[in-house]
Regions:
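Nucleotide-sugar donor-binding catalytic core of glycosyltransferases
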Residues: 1-198
Length: 198
């Protein structure tokens, strides 16, 4: 994490003159991996997570996250995929995309994951069961069967009819880039995760 160059500094610097003060900040953005918020007792603390965890409003003044919770003006549902490299226009076009005839000429299915840490076992089970039917190309570090991890995930997904797009867990609201990326390149996601509309 670069405190001088990140999504929040880029967004806020459009309207405000930012001063990054590591000693006495007015505002502190932190996450589940941050343990230094207690160093700033007078700062307004804003929690942001890309993980499946709920903000603790005993510690956070404000929060952004995945979950569908109502905490007045102190919480905004802001899924992590909104920070990824897509433009807002890309996301707006998702609802109007449909399967195209070029799917017929594509490879069968892919699976791109780096590890199985904190992942529900259903993801691995699905990969192995589907692989019994037909080879599923694994382009990540986990179960790689194509000669090494892919460098450009979206370019890789584009060559497939289907993408296994399983979240690490199934919780209402928890939606990551895993379902968005295949849709952007017109690969059909086989999705497991958030049961609500994302």
């Amino acid at each position: 994490f670069d405190p001088n160059n990140n999504f929040f500094t880029r967004l806020l610097s459009v309207k405000y003159d930012l001063v990054i003060d590591p000693v006495s900040p007015d505002y502190v953005f932190y996450s589940c991996f941050s343990f230094n918020i207690y160093k700033y007792p007078n700062a307004v603390k804003i929690y942001f997570t890309g993980e499946n965890d709920v903000p603790d409003f005993n510690l956070a003044d404000y929060a952004l996250g995945f979950h569908y919770i109502d905490f007045g003006d102190r919480y905004l549902r802001f899924p992590l995929y909104l920070l990824d490299h897509y433009s807002w226009n890309d996301l707006d076009t998702l609802s109007s995309k449909s399967a195209s005839s070029d799917l017929v000429n594509r490879k069968f299915c892919n699976f791109v994951y780096s590890n199985k840490k904190n992942a529900d076992p259903i993801r691995d089970k699905f990969f192995f069961e589907l692989s019994k039917y037909k080879k599923v190309d694994s382009g990540g570090r986990l179960y790689n069967n194509i000669g090494g991890p892919v460098k450009d995930k979206c370019a890789f997904l584009r060559d497939y009819k289907f993408t296994i797009a399983f979240e690490n867990s199934s919780v209402n609201g928890y939606t990551t880039e895993k379902v968005v990326e295949p849709m952007l390149v017109n690969s059909i996601p086989i999705y497991w995760g958030n049961r609500k509309r994302f």
